[in-house]
From Swiss-Prot:
Subcellular location: Cytoplasm
Pfam families per record: TsaD
GO-annotated molecular function: iron ion binding; N(6)-L-threonylcarbamoyladenine synthase activity
Keywords from the UniProt entry: Acyltransferase, Cytoplasm, Iron, Metal-binding, Transferase, tRNA processing
Stored InterPro entries: ATPase_NBD, Gcp-like_dom, KAE1/TsaD, Peptidase_M22_CS, TsaD
UniProt similarity note: Belongs to the KAE1 / TsaD family.
Gene that this polypeptide is encoded by: tsaD
Name of the molecule in the record: tRNA N6-adenosine threonylcarbamoyltransferase
Organism: Rickettsia peacockii (strain Rustic)
EC number: 2.3.1.234
Cofactor note: Binds 1 Fe(2+) ion per subunit.
Amino acid sequence: MIKILGIESSCDDTAVSIITENREILSNIIISQNTEHAVFGGVVPEIAARSHLSHLDKALKNVLKESNTKLTDISTIAATSGPGLIGGVIVGSMFARSLSSALKKPFIAINHLEGHALTARLTDNIPYPYLLLLASGGHCQFVAVLGLGKYKILGSTIDDAVGEAFDKVAKMLNLAFPGGPEIEKRAKLGDPHKYKFPKPIINSGNCNMSFSGLKTAVRTLIINLKEINDTVINDIAASFQFTIGEILSSKVQDAIRAYEQITNNFDKKNIVIAGGVAANKYLQKILSSCAKTYGYRLIYPPIHLCTDNAAMIAYAGLERYNNKLFTPLNFCPKARWSLEDISN
């Protein structure tokens, strides 16, 4: 049986996973660093890298035990090799390449964004091509996923990523880190129409997005408010989340038009939302409704596979393993690595 070992360390989650050729996840271990970074209100790259170094060996032992797998049973080792916080990326990549060398097993360098992009093929086995909205703390872009290693970016944020906007607004409201889940929780208790926030470049006619102005508008409101109590916090969270939904819904329409200009895929019309923001149930509901209007089905992974994980890295490794797309051990990890620059 083919077994793929996946390693993820691009940000603040140390993750190791083993999957089979049948897309079965045998084990998926994630060691979170949230408590280590919470006091700083965000991820500290140096702390993240050092934590990966101390957690990886433990995570590997746990995943082998949980999956009842020996290291010698592993067919290939896939590891995030960019983009991301370069210290953590180097730690994970070096760990994987050391294992590869010692075990004499192939190594596969995985683009972290490709891991997110292919998650829906792991969970739902959808065919190529499909439209992807990649929404996380570090990225926000619409991508035409045409095949393995064949990606066309249709539009992206021109400033902040949507996940970053969630985290920054949460910090303004003195909510816990990470901020996305806290905003969603507070929004359920608030009035989404209490405050009207701007929707930057919503009528631009292209697939690009902007969230910096929205973030600034929230900050300005908070500064000018005389009192900030729980009711106000809930209303701001709800109004902010509502505005994000409006922006993304509008841009999904633009992305569908752009996607249909470059594909002939009119039988199985799928839109995938991936990345940490895909875990937001309000956005899932809003975007599902928008997709349905245009005859598309919105697919989003289970919550534990929306955020950073190694199962998605292992699956991307499986697709590349099946196509014999291996990576030399002298591969240089990358802090920046566009989906369009992936080479097969």
